[in-house]
């Protein structure tokens, strides 16, 4: 998953609402979180210097494994948990947060599909399919994984998509 994007979307919403953010990144991508935290901290220092408005405590990063995530999920002071991961992880988080009447926002393992109907512009559909499946080398949760194609255009679309993928370098 692209760790900065999901954090940035959710953090921006929290800050607009006047809430602070605790980011517990995947233990596989801690440097991304630390770099973002550094940049955000510098922006806060400049904002404070220009306005006098205090910004401390708006963002914290916790580095650790599953135990750190579980502690955040269990803590009633954490009003909302936003988690990205597998469906089994999401089910566990949802149950634990619900047990304390908290809220959660879950982005779980997707299986994204594209539907191609007979009325589709096949050139445009081909470009969309190739970009959706290969645009980020498959390294995002929104990567196209399945095609649902009307049988009347299946052969023509397969030929176009195969040719397009053959052009990738």
Q: What do these predicted ranges mean?
A:
Residues 8-9, 34-35, 73, 92-96, ...:
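Short amphipathic alpha-helical segments
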Residues 11-12, 69, 90, 126:
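Generic hydrophobic/aromatic pocket-lining and core-packing "Φ" positions
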Residues 42-43, 80, 88-169:
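ALDH superfamily catalytic-core signature
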Residues 48-54, 59-82:
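A structured beta-alpha segment of the ubiquitous adenosine-cofactor-binding alpha/beta core
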Residues 25, 61-62, 70, 82-83, ...:
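Glycine- and other small-residue-rich loops at beta-strand/loop junctions that grip anionic moieties
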Residues 1-45, 101:
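Conserved small-residue-rich beta-alpha loop and adjacent elements
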Residues 1-2, 63-71, 85-92, 96:
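Beta-loop-alpha module in the N-terminal Rossmann-like domain of NAD(P)-dependent dehydrogenases
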């Amino acid at each position: 998953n692209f760790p900065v994007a999901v954090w940035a979307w959710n953090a921006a919403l929290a800050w607009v609402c006047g809430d602070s953010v605790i980011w517990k990144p995947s233990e596989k991508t801690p440097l991304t979180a630390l770099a973002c935290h550094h940049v955000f901290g510098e922006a806060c220092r400049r904002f404070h210097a220009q306005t006098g408005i205090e910004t401390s405590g708006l963002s914290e990063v916790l580095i650790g494994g599953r135990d750190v995530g579980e502690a955040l999920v269990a803590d009633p002071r954490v009003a909302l948990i936003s988690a990205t991961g597998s469906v089994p992880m999401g089910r566990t988080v949802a149950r634990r947060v619900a047990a304390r009447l908290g809220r959660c926002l879950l982005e779980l393992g997707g299986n994204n599909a594209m539907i191609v109907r007979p009325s589709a512009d096949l050139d445009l559909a081909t470009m969309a399919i190739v970009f959706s499946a290969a645009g980020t080398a498959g390294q995002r949760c929104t990567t196209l994984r399945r095609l649902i194609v009307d049988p009347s255009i299946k052969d023509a679309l397969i030929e176009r998509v195969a040719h397009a993928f053959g052009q990738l370098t």
